Design a protein with these regions (language model features):
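Ligand-binding beta-strand-loop-alpha-helix segment within the catalytic cores
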Residues: 13-15
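A generic structural motif
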Residues: 132-143
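Conserved catalytic-core segment of NTP-binding enzymes
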Residues: 1-11, 20-129
């Protein structure tokens, strides 16, 4: 409810609201009605899990058919760092409906040295081609909900 949101915003420096879910999959392409960004939203974070890389889109991407169409690849194409960066940076993908808001990418599940190297590849593409800043994160097993 609007009143509760306004109360939270007076109590906190930052309020994080999930604008759309990915059905527990590490990446997604938004549907026509997504994301649902509130007018008070001033920053958008596109989040993707690195566990998606090197797997077919159909196995790791929520709405794989939309992602495949957006990326001009078949649904059985393996998700590469380049494809993930393109999906996250696309105004039909991770940047959909962002407009003039601040936009950043968060790469989660950076749990191994190999995934850290892949995350650097994605981050380099986002920075060099799209001028998008990127952060990485991971949780230890005991920290996961």
């Amino acid at each position: 409810p609007q009143a509760q949101l306004e109360r939270w915003m007076t109590l906190a420096d930052i309020v994080l609201i999930e604008a759309d879910g990915a059905k527990r999959m590490p990446c997604k392409a938004p549907a026509a009605h997504e994301p649902v960004l509130l007018p008070q939203c001033d920053t958008v974070l596109a989040v993707a899990g690195l566990s998606a890389l090197r797997h077919p889109l159909r196995e790791v991407c929520f709405r794989a058919e939309l992602a495949a169409e957006l990326l001009c690849v078949p649904q059985d194409a393996q998700l590469t760092p380049e494809l993930l960066a393109n999906l996250l940076a696309s105004e039909a993908g991770g940047r959909k409906a962002v407009g003039d808001r601040s936009f950043y990418v968060v790469l989660n599940q950076v749990d191994t040295k190999e995934q850290a190297a892949l995350a650097r590849q994605v981050a380099d593409i986002l920075k060099k081609i799209y001028r998008i800043s990127c952060a990485t994160s991971h949780f230890e097993k005991g920290e996961r909900a």
